[in-house]
Amino acid sequence: FLTMNIKIIASVGVVLLCSLNGYAQVLHLDNALQRSAENYDRIKSKKSIVSAFEQNTVFQKQQYLPDVTLAAQQSFGTINMVHGSMYAYGGLASASTSLPLAEQNWNAAFGSLYFANVNWNLFTFGRIKNEVKLGQSKEKTAIADLEQEIFQLQVKTSAAYLNLLASQRLQFVQEKNLERAQVFFEMTDSRAKSGLIPEVDASLAKAEVSNAKSLQIKSYDKVLEYSKQLAVFLGEEFQTYQLDSLYSTTIPKNILSPENSDVSKHPLLQLQQSKVDQSLQSESLVKTQRLPNLSAFGVLQGRGSGFESNYMQDNSAYSGSYLKGVGIDRGNYLLGFTLSWNITNLYRFNSKVKEQQYFTQSLKQDYDLLHKELNAQSKLAQSQLANAYENFEETKVQLSAAQLAYRQHTALYENGLTTLVDYTQALYALNRAEIDYEIAQNNVWQALLLLASSQGDLEILTQKH
């Protein structure tokens, strides 16, 4: 039994030690924001998209390189030909070459074709250049999308952080309320047993203890709920967190001023502007489709055949040997330039240019709308922050008065100078005042978060106040 008890004590000690270690490390808000940006799967997905667009930009730059084609073909067949015309619809005609013979025969031999082909777009009148720029614009848009996704995640993480902090503070308030209720019950129960007060007072005091315990349990449920939310945003397993007391013991300094209403650098606006720039670049690319293309080409070719050069005079002058037909008997080269211009594109692509211009116009209008909404949201946040400051000052007055009233009613009840109803009302008032105080203090930070999110700058929230 002694050994078993030692094992139990050791196990409990390990659990307590792990719990203490878990609570010993304070999770600061700036650290939480960093961890969310690194671990959240949605952010990882956006980073992969950015990498994909980076590779697309590299591919577009590689379009400056020439097309170089190497090919080797070996075949076996006849070379019967006749005079006449034909059109090879949907593909190439037969590659057999010969003069027409007097009659059909089925002589067959091996043949071969080897060639190297180079085609280089020397001058595309800006088409490839604009394709590269469009690829770079898409990459910038993907980066802007990643940044706004990180910003939105960090706003949600900050809200979850503050909500968890508020729930922890409310749990602490309910624990203090439970302690007061238990002290009150012990005092009432002892006096009731002594016959100084009716037994019903002790029963009511016991009910108050149960009610306080219920409120404490419900407050802990909220702590667990917001802990889960924060853990999800951090990309971690469910756990409890010890948060920075800065956001529960102080309020931010008053930063309201006209200079703090700039929203031009908001990540959402930056993303929308990058979409506008991408659309403008698409306009430039579409315009180049109306222009000609100048290219250089070169071909080096070698051919072999099992048919001899005098086959037309002597139909037996051929060999069915594979090695005879796959060698190179003749070679040719070809060099030149090609200037191609589909002149109907001058008319055809006018509609495509106008189409893209309308897309650009739509994106600009969306940008203007978003800018107005963020400006309005910023002004609203400033007003709400000012109200939060004022409300917090009022809750301090409320809490001070409730604490004084509770102490007075406690003294009066202990001396039999007030009723149980008056005392419990003072107890309720103090609990409500403590809750209002904690909520009002947290609301100041929540209002500051709203201001930071509307202006696109979370440093307003994370800087030391």
Q: Which residues are covered by each model-predicted region?
A:
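Sec/SRP-type N-terminal targeting helices
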Residues: K44-S48, K61, W106-A108, L122-I150, ...
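N-terminal signal peptide c-region/cleavage motif recognized by signal peptidases
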Residues: S19-N21
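Bacterial Sec-pathway N-terminal export signals of envelope proteins
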Residues: A24-N80, L122, E237-F238, L243-S282, ...
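Periplasmic alpha-helical coiled-coil/stalk elements that build and connect Gram-negative outer-membrane
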Residues: Q152-P267, L430, Y437
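Short flexible linkers and secondary-structure junctions
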Residues: V26-A159
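Acidic, low-complexity, intrinsically disordered peripheral segments
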Residues: L2-T3, I9, T69, T78, ...
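Short segments within alpha-helical structural elements
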Residues: A52, S214-E236, L399-D457
